[in-house]
Amino acid sequence: MTIIYGQDIGLIHQKLSQIKSNSPYKTIWFKDLKQLYDLFSQPLFGSNNEKFIVNNCSFLEKTSLTRQENLCLEKLKTTDVVLTVYTDNPFSGIKTIKSITTVFCDKLDWKSMHKAIGEVCRELNLKLDLEIIDWLANALPLNMGVIYQEINKLSLLGKNEIKDNKLVETVICDYQPVQIYKLTKALTNSQIVKAFKYIDELASTKPNFATQFLEFFSGELLLALMVKSCNPKQLTNINLNVNQFRLIAIQSQYHNFTSKVLVNIINAIQKLDIKLKHNDGFAIPLLKNFALSFFTN
């Protein structure tokens, strides 16, 4: 028996694709122990004719197993069945059973992104220029499922289209603002510890996030300045090419900031942007110092 585990479901399913390319497997989803008992009770189970992958075996996420669950593992351990568990820390006992092979799908990090993208491209028989691979490594989140989904979209483009950087950028979804939005919200709520955590996380996964963050943040601050004194009716009629509900959310998020403070922060962002361009290696301390200067109670 093989147990494949990890938090990145996309990485697990990439590993399963490799397994299935060498031998046919039938894939099922775990429901309960009875389902597994019924499985190994089948006459052909364990023969060369029938091999199974059982996804999301959630009972293996526990720190200890019941008697029935342990018995189930004992029955399955000498078979070719493959179980998947969507956690980094499954039941520790599986690693002590000699007949069980465990495979850990470690989380992606920025250093492994190029390799991950390359593997997906090979699987999809897709050739991308190094420049586009570099851009994808910075634009996509550390999630193999998302990486596969986005690169699969690129496989639908023509040979000439796939070389058009601007076209590729329009096809790929923009995932960065979601992470950056969490950082801006933490700052405006004076949650400095949380903000520092987001800065560290973004810096570890997106090397040029600081400039993107400042662009996003200054845009929000400008909108906040424009709608600060607007009433709900004015927000409905205002023409800023921005969704009305987003304007309401921005007005609410920045309601404690005076116009003078908003202007001061915008000016500070402009100065910080220049500093970052000249001292890129100091992005994290410069950002944290900026956060402490304006967003502590």
From Swiss-Prot:
- The entry's protein name is Probable DNA polymerase III subunit delta
**Self-association or partners: how does it assemble?**
Component of the DNA clamp loading complex consisting of tau(3):delta(1):delta'(1). The DNA polymerase III holoenzyme complex contains at least 10 different subunits organized into 3 functionally essential subassemblies: the Pol III core, the beta sliding clamp processivity factor and the clamp-loading complex. The Pol III core (subunits alpha, epsilon and theta) contains the polymerase and the 3'-5' exonuclease proofreading activities. The polymerase is tethered to the template via the dimeric beta sliding clamp processivity factor.
Keyword Transferase in record: yes
GO biological process annotations for this chain's record? DNA-templated DNA replication
Q: Which GO terms describe its molecular function?
A: DNA binding; DNA-directed DNA polymerase activity
Q: What class of enzyme is it?
A: transferase
Species of provenance: Mycoplasma genitalium (strain ATCC 33530 / DSM 19775 / NCTC 10195 / G37) (Mycoplasmoides genitalium)
Q: SUPFAM superfamilies annotated for this entry? A: post-AAA+ oligomerization domain-like
Q: What is the lineage of its organism?
A: Bacteria, Bacillati, Mycoplasmatota, Mycoplasmoidales, Mycoplasmoidaceae
Its gene name is: holA
Catalysed reactions listed for this entry = DNA(n) + a 2'-deoxyribonucleoside 5'-triphosphate = DNA(n+1) + diphosphate
Alphabetic keyword roster: DNA replication, DNA-directed DNA polymerase, Nucleotidyltransferase, Transferase
The UniProt entry, under InterPro entries, shows: DNA_pol3_clamp-load_cplx_C (IPR008921), DNA_polIII_delta (IPR005790)
The yes or no answer to whether the keyword Transferase is present is: yes
| Family per similarity comment | Belongs to the DNA polymerase HolA subunit family.
